[in-house]
């Protein structure tokens, strides 16, 4: 089993895009199999996602960090300016934090989160969105000081309307 001390967290580069896409898709398939249709999860395409991650890595205001072990990337996070209508200048949003299922429960997500939070100016408001049925993620974010602030939205994912909950940390 992997241990957090065997994992390095570093800024992502465009050459990481395909590996990030593979982790992204494996995580979605593992985490959302009870929430999203199998047809949608099986349709997720590495090359398409890699293009999105290449753009994210080069975006000026976005920070993408990769967690990797001796085999390669096992997790990543993406953080940038908060996109919500009620966001104040300087508010941040965690757009994504995903781990390959083989890294679940190893402490790598905790270390990624700590790295993100340690990189923020004290007092910065941070938000993120979680699918309503994703109890594992909600528990993880609560442990890191995030709370559901009552804001919800409906996003269509895989042809299905799904409720997302906003969690915030001040």
Please provide the spans of the model-predicted regions:
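Conserved beta-strand-loop-alpha-helix junction that forms the acyl-donor binding cleft
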Residues: 104, 128-138, 154-160
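Conserved GNAT acetyl-CoA-binding A-motif
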Residues: 120-130
